[in-house]
């Protein structure tokens, strides 16, 4: 392969790598939680999901395809609570109602609620999350229903490298250097290969 073709190929590869390494792109994952007492992850009481900022948590409510007596269908009111409310499974401990799973026999399928973990929300009823913090959800059965276990979920928002909220000490989050050079990783990896191809 002639030298100029190798250089052009390498430049194209580096360009694609740099373009795909754009830090401005928002990449998110979705995590599904099936909120019902038959979900084994709820049985020990330590169900935890780890998310990152911009990820989604999808809560799927109980749903029944076959007809069942109403008293056998699971219905829940989900609350976001503080640590004490999670530990005691008491939504009155600084908790607020988040969602209501109240249509287990809906012909259109299970109710699904989604939580987006974001630093800032444009919605007045939205919730803002901070990296490095834990958030807690519990459910309470409707008042006329007894013998329902307490279902609890802990969500941990992973710290990020560019977050200003993950360290209580500002010295660890501020950039004290007078200048910084932001070089994409792909360029640093490809530079030695490029020089090797040119030298051969």
From Swiss-Prot:
InterPro entries: Cupredoxin, Ephrin, Ephrin-A_Ecto, Ephrin_CS, Ephrin_RBD
Primary localisation category: membrane
Lipidation sites (GPI-anchor amidated asparagine): 175
The keyword GTP-binding appears for this protein: no
Keywords carried by this UniProt record: Cell membrane, Disulfide bond, Glycoprotein, GPI-anchor, Lipoprotein, Membrane, Signal
One Pfam entry name: Ephrin
GO CC annotation, single: plasma membrane
Expressing tissues: Expressed in a gradient across the tectum being more strongly expressed at the posterior pole.
GO biological process: axon guidance; bone remodeling; ephrin receptor signaling pathway; osteoclast differentiation
TM region(s), chain numbering: none
Propeptide stretches in the record: 176-200
Membrane topology annotation: Lipid-anchor; GPI-anchor
Keyword Protease attributed: no
Residues annotated as glycosylated: 36, 161, 175
Record's subcellular location: Cell membrane
Ephrin RBD domain span: 28-161
Protein family: Belongs to the ephrin family.
Record note on quaternary structure: Binds to the receptor tyrosine kinases EPHA3, EPHA4 and EPHA5. Interacts with EPHA8; activates EPHA8.
Its biological purpose: Cell surface GPI-bound ligand for Eph receptors, a family of receptor tyrosine kinases which are crucial for migration, repulsion and adhesion during neuronal, vascular and epithelial development. Binds promiscuously Eph receptors residing on adjacent cells, leading to contact-dependent bidirectional signaling into neighboring cells. The signaling pathway downstream of the receptor is referred to as forward signaling while the signaling pathway downstream of the ephrin ligand is referred to as reverse signaling.
Protein name in UniProt: Ephrin-A2
Species this protein is from: Gallus gallus
């Amino acid at each position: 392969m002639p030298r100029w073709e190798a250089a052009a190929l390498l430049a194209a590869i580096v360009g694609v790598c740099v373009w795909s390494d754009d830090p401005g792109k928002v990449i998110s994952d979705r995590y599904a939680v099936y909120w019902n007492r038959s979900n084994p992850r709820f049985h020990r009481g330590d169900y935890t999901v780890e998310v990152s900022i911009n990820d989604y948590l999808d809560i799927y409510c109980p749903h029944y395809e076959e007809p069942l007596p109403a008293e056998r269908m699971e219905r829940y009111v989900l609350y976001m609570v503080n640590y004490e409310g999670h530990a005691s499974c008491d939504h009155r401990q600084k908790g607020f109602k988040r969602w209501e799973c109240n249509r287990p026999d809906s012909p259109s399928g299970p109710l699904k609620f989604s939580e987006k973990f974001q630093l800032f929300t444009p919605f007045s009823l939205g919730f803002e999350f901070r990296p490095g913090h834990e958030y807690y959800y519990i459910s309470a059965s409707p008042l006329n229903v007894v013998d329902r276990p307490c279902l609890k979920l802990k969500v941990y928002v992973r710290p990020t490298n560019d977050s200003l909220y993950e360290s209580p000490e500002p010295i660890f989050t501020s950039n004290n250097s007078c200048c910084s050079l932001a070089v994409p990783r792909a360029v640093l990896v490809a530079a030695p290969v490029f020089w090797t191809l040119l030298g051969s």
